[in-house]
Amino acid sequence: MVVKTIENLRLILKNELIYSSKSNKQTVLFLTGGTSIQKLYKSEKWLKIFNSFNKICFADERMVLESNSESNLGNFLRITKINPKKVVKILDKSGNLYEGYSKNITHFLKSKVYNCYAISGFGLDGHFWSLFTQIDMIKNDIVLRTKSTNHSHERITLGVKAYELLDANYFFASKEKLAKYNSDPKEPVKSYMNKIFTL
């Protein structure tokens, strides 16, 4: 596994944005959940990167309202103060999945008009996004609903099919989490990881 810094990742994404612009492509960034990535939300350099994407989506989200402190999307909006119109909403004000959400995500990933990238976190039990089980890993859905016995909320997550449609995926972790992970790497996530970026 190759480990690089988060600054390397910022420069990679900056170059991808330049390439996409020259190719007349729209850009979509899928973000991960968790606390480590929230450090990027407070960086002016990263805010510039986020604002350069046409759309921001979340690869995994708990089935909670945006006002809830456990909402990945809600925390992103609260910390970054980014233009909310850039962010693709998942749940309505009643906590129900927006009609057409899966269709919109599928359109981004399959359309030749968009270049789609993801910054993906992973769990110490071996999952990435919210793909907790082997059943999740073999489902052919682009967007799926799942739940882990270790977590209290249902999740909306991208499936492995979505992973295959991304133009690029970049795994990200704190140094502390990476050290724990390297001491006991778990499937299935290690099968997908050849490069990781860390703070």
Give the residues covered by each predicted segment:
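Short acidic/glycine-rich loop or secondary-structure boundary segments that cap or lie
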Residues: L65-S67, L97-Y98, D125-F132, M137, ...
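Glycine-rich beta-strand-to-loop/alpha-helix junction loops that act as flexible
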Residues: L31-S36, S120-L124
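Ligand-binding beta-strand-loop-alpha-helix segment within the catalytic cores
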Residues: R10, N51-I119
